Structure formats: structure tokens, C-alpha cells
């Protein structure tokens, strides 16, 4: 009986860790090198990018904003994502941004192995 109890506990611990790993999300930031309003960014980038991530079951958009200079001009737009698999998500995000016409200087940023990784879109 002790053997089965130990075996049961081992399986319970294994499945608890497996479920926890499945729920892991990774933050990713996209910097779009374009002066674009929040509404226009949503239409041009956010909505299609969200659909691509959802279709691939890789994550979602969780926020965004614009960087504004002292004169009040938008310098660049940002999109915040949470993805479930960095290896699969980054190529999907990059290709979608290329397809959507993200300009040169746009980047995808995330952390891996304790280091910041910056991937140019173009």
C-alpha cells in the first residue's frame, strides 16, 4: 500500500509541475518605429497581430502605448504581448510585422536566459 501511495504522490507532483509549465507565459515587447496614433496602431498592427497569435495558439496582446517627445509628437508605438512559446512566437510575430509594413528600426524585445534580446523586424 505504501508503494501505491508513493507512486500516486509522484504522479501528483509531476502533473502539478507539468500544468504549471503549461501555464508559463513570456512577456514580449514590440517597438514600431512609426508615428502612429493609438487607434490607427490598433487597426494596422494590434488587431492583425492578435489574430495571428490566437490562430497559432501562441499568446495574446496585453497592452500598448506610444512614446511621445517633449513637443507632443508620437515617436514610436509599442505593443505588449504575452506568449506561451518564445521559439515559435518570435518568427510568427516578426513575419506578421513584415507583412503589415512595420518600418525599418522596428524591433521585438524579450528576455531569455536572463539576457535582453532585441530582434530587428527588418
Question: PLM features: residue spans?
Answer:
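Bacterial N-terminal signal peptides that target proteins for export
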Residues: 1-8
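Bacterial N-terminal signal peptides
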Residues: 8-16
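Long, contiguous binding/interaction regions
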Residues: 22-80, 84-122
Amino acid at each position: 500500500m505504501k508503494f501505491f501511495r508513493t507512486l500516486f504522490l509522484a504522479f501528483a507532483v509531476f502533473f502539478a509541475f507539468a500544468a504549471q509549465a503549461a501555464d508559463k507565459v513570456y512577456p514580449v515587447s514590440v517597438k514600431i518605429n512609426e508615428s502612429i496614433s493609438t487607434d490607427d496602431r490598433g487597426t494596422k498592427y494590434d488587431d492583425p497581430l492578435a489574430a495571428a497569435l490566437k490562430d497559432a495558439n501562441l499568446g495574446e496582446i496585453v497592452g500598448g502605448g506610444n512614446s511621445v517627445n517633449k513637443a507632443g509628437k508620437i515617436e514610436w508605438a509599442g505593443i505588449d504581448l504575452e506568449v506561451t512559446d518564445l521559439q515559435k512566437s518570435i518568427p510568427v510575430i516578426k513575419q506578421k510585422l513584415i507583412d503589415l509594413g512595420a518600418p525599418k528600426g522596428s524591433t521585438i524585445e524579450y528576455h531569455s536566459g536572463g539576457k535582453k534580446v532585441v530582434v530587428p523586424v527588418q
